[in-house]
Design a protein with these regions (language model features):
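Acidic, mature catalytic/reactive cores of soluble proteins
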Residues: 1-186
């Protein structure tokens, strides 16, 4: 919206992106992250094919719309939407096995119809390649955020520090870590 001044930055020492929307009367932040953390066995890292979006109300009653237009299977076919009470399932007519699930604390029909949303409290969205068997709610989202934050802070704390260009080097290391496989290949 032209009413908002928008700024983006990473949460320091992490791969968690924060986008801030500020106007005279309203302010909110959109925090995007892919979960990444160690399970009970410290050698294994949990990295599901998921993206969380946490929408944090800071002041006022911000208004916005969500433009959800997925193009599964590289947009080779028409996108099919199936809405349940828990999620929006999407897949392509060219490959019905490649499915995505959008979970949200916001009304799903408002997302699909791109209706204006009034942010009265913190909300979340989760885009996943897997249907969830456990309940997806804002408490689960906050837990995933905390685990991911701790993972990245611990990881960057263990990296070498440089006296010159450390911020740029650390950002490069974080991006490379995101793109690396479990065996170390990039």
């Amino acid at each position: 919206s032209p009413d908002y001044q928008i700024s983006q930055s990473y949460v320091p020492h992490t791969n968690i992106l924060s986008t801030n929307f500020v106007s005279e009367e309203n302010e909110f932040a959109v925090v995007d992250f892919m979960p990444c953390y160690h399970l009970s066995d410290a050698s294994n890292c949990y990295r599901p094919a998921e993206i969380y979006r946490y929408i944090r109300r800071i002041k006022g009653t911000p208004r916005f719309k969500i433009n959800y237009e997925p193009a599964p299977d590289y947009a080779r076919g028409k996108t099919i939407f199936n809405t349940t009470s828990e999620y929006i399932e999407t897949y392509s007519t060219s490959n019905s096995k490649d499915r995505q699930y959008l979970y949200s604390s916001l009304p799903l029909h408002n997302i699909l119809e791109q209706k204006e949303i009034v942010l009265a409290k913190d909300e979340f969205l989760l885009l996943s390649y897997n249907e969830k068997v456990i309940p997806v709610n804002i408490e689960r989202e906050k837990l995933e955020y905390c685990r991911t934050l701790v993972y990245w802070l611990n990881w960057t704390d263990r990296t070498k520090k440089f006296t010159v260009y450390n911020d740029v080097i650390e950002r490069s290391l974080l991006v490379l870590k995101l793109m690396s496989f479990y065996n170390g290949a990039v």
